[in-house]
UniProtKB/Swiss-Prot annotation:
Catalysis: reaction(s): N-(5-phospho-beta-D-ribosyl)anthranilate = 1-(2-carboxyphenylamino)-1-deoxy-D-ribulose 5-phosphate
Phylogenetic lineage: Bacteria, Pseudomonadati, Pseudomonadota, Acidithiobacillia, Acidithiobacillales
Keyword Translocase assigned: no
Gene name of the encoded protein: trpF
InterPro entries: Aldolase_TIM (IPR013785), PRAI_dom (IPR001240), RibuloseP-bd_barrel (IPR011060), TrpF_fam (IPR044643)
Name the UniProt record assigns to this protein: N-(5'-phosphoribosyl)anthranilate isomerase
Amino acid sequence: MPMVRIKICGITNTEDARAAAAAGADAVGLVFYRSSPRALDAVRARKILAALPPFVTRVGLFVNAEAADVAATLQQCPLDVLQFHGDESPSLCRGFGRPYIKVLRVTAAQDLRPAVDAYHDAQGLLLDCAAPGVWGGSGRSFDWWRLPDLGKPLILAGGLHAENVAEAIAIARPYAVDVSSGVELSPGRKDHDKMARFVARVRGT
């Protein structure tokens, strides 16, 4: 099985960013969604991005943001990939000249082909648990199933932590996994030991 990539999301400070990279994360996520306890402004985000070493992908998470707000963030922050967590249209997602990931909110096995077709130019699709009234990551898991080969990288998120990620990977066989609350001490504050254990469990699959 190919190596499963790892993204640690909800980074809010330089210390956690460096620790995520040192643990072996392939990507880190910064949240630009004001209602999130992990939300950042551009000034803080720039400091975090500057602290990351080379070859760590910098992902910016947005939820139903206005196109002008996304563009303004991109002018100030050197993001590599955009992640859209709301009801964004394909035309909005592709309108910034950056690779993007579209999040799909799911509860169990479903046909992913319509989303693959609609967001055909997405770099990947991220599957997160659908929770009423919750945007930007629910922290809840859903019933994993064997993900189909649709010619598009599929990323697994939602309620993952060191104790269940190996099982999730064995069942779903995703391209990558995405974790936030599962490696935290409190919302927005990462537990460096949990991050290291999570990465070790993924690398051990």
